[in-house]
């Protein structure tokens, strides 16, 4: 059996549930039902709902074989786990921020000052790398308040849009850490349970598919060479003969190809110009590596 620890609430919960569904492992019964455990469509893969901040230690200590949580939390806990895959969601930027009316312009200006944060380990590493000595003060919330009540001169805190900083009359002067959500594994479990790599492959197939689109089109045989030159495809386009029609004077071919999603606009326009018609652009659910 493989036990996977996933966030039980917060901004990481819904994207995590979605990637399981997209990977063909939908979870039956979510954390909203107040359950601690749930099942997937694979009888050997079970789900453990936990606080995102606790998941690194659950995986490190073997309470879970696999986990999904933010790299900021993994790094902060110093967990001895194997990072298997960047899942590309849940981006969190830890920024160094100071009062907007202060004279601090860069991290080096905070030599000997107090910095409040919910991420003391990441903050210490950040300032040590810069060679700046500061007094790191751990807080458990409302970090933005600390410079205004004399507890700290600056903060290191999560910021996405910067709106919270603006509301609290703070300005970001540097990026201390950038994080996304990772699939992690217990090192012993990874060595002994082959199915963990199957789970990684399933998630990887979803991520690969998000970057690609499937193109289908009809192409006159005389235009095939020009069309093939336009299509970059993963391993070249697939070409199939279309049943001839009494209304068509030229043989028609069906051409299928997988292309990068961000190239769709350019490629479709080029295909039309060299003779392709009836072009369909289809999203892809999974691409197995």
UniProtKB/Swiss-Prot annotation:
GO terms for molecular function: ATP binding; ATP phosphoribosyltransferase activity; magnesium ion binding. It comes from Methanosarcina mazei (strain ATCC BAA-159 / DSM 3647 / Goe1 / Go1 / JCM 11833 / OCM 88). This is ATP phosphoribosyltransferase. It catalyses: 1-(5-phospho-beta-D-ribosyl)-ATP + diphosphate = 5-phospho-alpha-D-ribose 1-diphosphate + ATP. Feedback inhibited by histidine. Catalyzes the condensation of ATP and 5-phosphoribose 1-diphosphate to form N'-(5'-phosphoribosyl)-ATP (PR-ATP). Has a crucial role in the pathway because the rate of histidine biosynthesis seems to be controlled primarily by regulation of HisG enzymatic activity. It is found in: Cytoplasm. It holds the Pfam family HisG_C. One of its GO terms (biological process) is L-histidine biosynthetic process.
């Amino acid at each position: 059996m493989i036990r996977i620890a996933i966030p039980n609430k917060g901004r990481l919960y819904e994207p995590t549930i979605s990637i399981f569904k997209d990977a063909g492992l939908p979870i039956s019964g979510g954390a909203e039902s107040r359950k601690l455990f749930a099942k997937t469509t694979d009888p050997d893969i079970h789900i453990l709902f936990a606080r995102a901040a606790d998941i690194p230690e659950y995986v490190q200590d073997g309470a879970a074989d696999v986990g999904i949580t933010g790299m900021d939390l993994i790094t902060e806990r110093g967990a001895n786990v194997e990072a298997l895959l960047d899942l590309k969601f849940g981006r969190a930027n830890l920024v160094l921020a100071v009062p907007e009316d202060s004279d601090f312009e860069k991290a080096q200006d905070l030599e000997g000052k107090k910095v409040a944060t919910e991420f003391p380990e990441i903050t210490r590493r950040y300032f040590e790398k810069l060679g700046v000595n500061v007094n790191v003060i751990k807080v458990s919330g409302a970090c933005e308040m600390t410079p205004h009540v004399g507890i700290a001169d600056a903060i290191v805190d999560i910021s996405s849009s910067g709106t919270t900083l603006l509301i609290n009359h703070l300005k970001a002067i540097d990026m201390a850490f950038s994080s996304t959500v990772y699939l992690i594994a217990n090192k012993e479990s990874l060595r002994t349970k082959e199915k963990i790599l199957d789970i990684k492959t399933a998630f990887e197939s979803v991520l690969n598919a998000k970057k690609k689109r499937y193109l289908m089109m009809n192409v006159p045989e005389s235009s095939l060479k020009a069309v093939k030159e336009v299509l970059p495809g993963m391993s070249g386009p697939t070409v199939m003969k279309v049943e001839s029609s009494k209304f068509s004077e030229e043989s028609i071919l069906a051409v299928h190809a997988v292309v990068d999603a961000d190239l769709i606009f350019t490629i479709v326009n080029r295909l039309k110009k060299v003779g392709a018609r009836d072009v369909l652009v289809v999203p892809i659910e999974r691409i197995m590596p």
